[in-house]
Amino acid sequence: MERDLISVESRDLNEAELGYRTEPFVKMQPAFKDYLWGGTKLKEHYGKHCDYDSIAESWELSAHEAGQSIVASGRYKGRLFADNLSKIGRENCGWKCQSIERFPILVKLIDAKENLSVQVHPDDDYALSRENEYGKNEMWYVLEHEEGAGIKCGF
């Protein structure tokens, strides 16, 4: 459905209503994580630049308190992604975002040079009560892998 798309143009808004000019697409500066298992492929193959020697994760689109993306182009360049959402309003982020306080999706690139630890992710109720964050439902799209690599889930 078209209304599921994230766009600042999801309804007929104009500058007079909003008090500012909308831009349909903006570039984001990711937040980087340098966990022990990270590698150098995000730098070497994907052009990610940061001060870390290795990058485990590049949080491409994040309103998470532990690492927010920064708007890297357009009128709101330099603003935190979450602050930008506050300015354009949740109503412009799709109808499913109306009942939440924060943007619920975290898009990241991962370079797992070493094995990761076992990951156990709580549901929303548990995570909100313990860490004031949403739970982690995940979807993975593997861009490339080494011979013999694998993912185990659901055990």
Per-region residue spans from a language model:
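Transition-metal
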Residues: 1-154
